[in-house]
Amino acid sequence: MENNKCGTMRGESVYLAYPFILGSVIFVEFFIFGLVYLTFGLGLKTIIITSGVILICLLPISIILIRLFIKSIAGKNKGKLIKKYTKLKILNKKYKILKVLLFIVGINFYLFGNLVSLNINPYTKFVLYSISAFFIIISIVVGDVIVEFYENGVFINPLGFYKWGEVGKEDLNDRLILKIDKLVIECKR
């Protein structure tokens, strides 16, 4: 059986950009169109179709903005790329529990919106559904990271940039177990 290599990095900072920006885009969109629905009395079908079209347009824009944001927080001389891991898994139990709890919260908001839909106005229903989408999206993307080893440090997208620690460049094999602050990440290629 292959022994996993283990290394420790000195973390500088942790960022969770993707979940909150993407979730916020969806939340704001439904919030605005909920107001439009109440103000101008547009049909629910029109609002849903228009929201979907605008969401499709907003996602690429938000991804571009996220990329720029990530570059700004990691705006350092990273040096040459040594190795990139794309199949990663955060082994901390609290992240697994967090994913499940966030998903349950999102489903609860969705079910609550369905159960009380006859007794509430459409605006409130939109708010409940947007909150549901926000939590479900966060539950899906929490722990979804990419690790890139550069000459001058390690960039964990979207968590941030870290300096080299005890892990050596010769240890960058498949199934590397990387410890950064309190995070434990299994790296696979």
From Swiss-Prot:
Topological type in the membrane:
Multi-pass membrane protein
GO CC terms: plasma membrane
Where, by residue number, does the polypeptide cross the bilayer? 20-40, 46-66, 100-120, 126-146
Q: Specify where it is mainly localized.
A: membrane
Task: Tell me the disulfide pairings in this chain.
Answer: none
Provide the protein's localization. Cell membrane
- Keyword Membrane, does the record have it? yes
Q: Does the keyword Repressor apply?
A: no
The alphabetized UniProt keywords are: Cell membrane, Membrane, Transmembrane, Transmembrane helix
Name the protein family.
Answer: To M.jannaschii MJ0795.1 and MJ1249.1.
The name of this protein is Uncharacterized protein MJ0785.1
